[in-house]
Amino acid sequence: MKLLISQVEFEQLIGRQEPEPGVVLPQFTVIYFTAAWCSACRSLDLDALEKGVPGVNWLKCDIDQNDYTPGYCGVRSIPTFLIVHDKKVVGMLSSNKTQKVLEWVAAAAPPTK
């Protein structure tokens, strides 16, 4: 998973800031909020998440490296997942169950072409 390092990157995803010239933003992104010390986060199968639903752009936000974005998004616990679809935040889920997260993402994902 690519790291979501700054609030600027998040604001580009939700259309509050313009991306760099030539950068095409993904239509459907899931942001995974985590921390190195989070034992519940380690129980997730990140490979299964990334491969489980086609067409999903996955980003990881370490709350100790980027503490502004989780607060801005209302993240209260980790692991938490946030869906951004067509520049809108459309869902949030706090869970350390890989299958539950996959089912939630699959239900929200647009059909793949």
Per-segment meaning from a language model:
Residues 1-29, 104-113:
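N-terminal leader/targeting and pre-domain segments
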Residues 26-27, 34-37, 77:
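Short pre-active-site segment immediately N-terminal to redox-active cysteine/selenocysteine motifs
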Residues 38-41, 81:
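The canonical Cys-X-X-Cys-His
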Residues 77, 82-113:
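Non-catalytic, surface beta->alpha helical segment in thiol-disulfide oxidoreductase systems
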